[in-house]
Regions:
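Asparagine-centered polar/low-complexity signal
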Residues: 22, 159-160, 172
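Short, well-ordered beta-strand elements
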Residues: 152-158
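C-terminal substrate-binding/catalytic lobe of Rossmann-fold NAD(P)-dependent oxidoreductases
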Residues: 2-151
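Short, glycine-/Ser/Thr-/acidic-enriched flexible segments
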Residues: 81, 146, 159-162, 177
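Glycine-rich phosphate/pyrophosphate-binding beta-alpha loops
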Residues: 62-66, 158-163
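Amphipathic terminal alpha-helices
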Residues: 167-184
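Short active-site-adjacent structural elements
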Residues: 149-150, 163-165
């Protein structure tokens, strides 16, 4: 389930600002798009085409009256039941493919793992990465749990306008330039 800020709706979202403290449990076409895009992102490139990952994604999307940051509740089913320590270690040890590439908009900490309760929160954590001078480029993960039936459950927060849009686009361009996919 995603809880997407009103600014994520562009100009149409501005009308929602007139309905403060509200949650709208439907974003037209967003659930279908999210299900398909997740499988594409997690898929493989084969013969110049993306082959979507072979697993199901079930999404629910709500628009929330928050200034910045999309919050997502994620439940993952895995083949072998992990321990909570293994999941926490995997998140803590995560390193991006762009680590060490000296890209100006790449945060040193692409993912921040919260161990305290009730985090991440858009009001408190939408600008993670501020210490590095890259506010909003770090995603936050928290409330990590392994359920009784072995599923991994957590919340993830990312800044929709900085990491998800403008900053993410600049970072992609920097990477494309570094990889010589595009020229100066």
């Amino acid at each position: 389930s995603t809880y997407q800020v009103v600014t994520g709706a562009g100009n149409a979202g501005l009308a929602l600002l007139e309905q403060p403290f509200n949650v709208i449990p439907h974003i037209p076409e967003e659930e279908t798009k999210m299900e398909a895009e997740t499988r594409k992102i997690m898929g493989r490139l084969s013969r110049g085409k993306v082959r979507p990952a072979d697993f199901s994604v079930v999404a629910s999307c709500a628009r929330v009256w928050v200034r910045d940051g999309h919050l997502e509740s994620v439940v993952v089913t895995v083949d072998e039941e992990p321990t909570l320590d293994e999941v926490v270690e995997a998140f803590s040890a995560f390193r991006s493919e762009i680590d060490g590439r000296d890209l100006h908009t790449a945060p040193k900490e692409p993912v921040h793992l919260f161990t305290e309760d009730a985090r991440p929160q858009p009001a408190l954590d939408a600008y993670l990465g501020e210490a590095e001078g890259l506010p909003g480029m770090t995603a936050g993960i928290g409330q990590v749990k392994v359920t009784e039936d072995g599923r991994i459950r957590f919340f993830v927060l990312s800044n929709n306008t900085i990491r998800g849009s403008a900053g993410g686009s600049v970072l992609n361009a920097e990477l494309a330039l570094a990889e010589r996919v595009i020229g100066p």
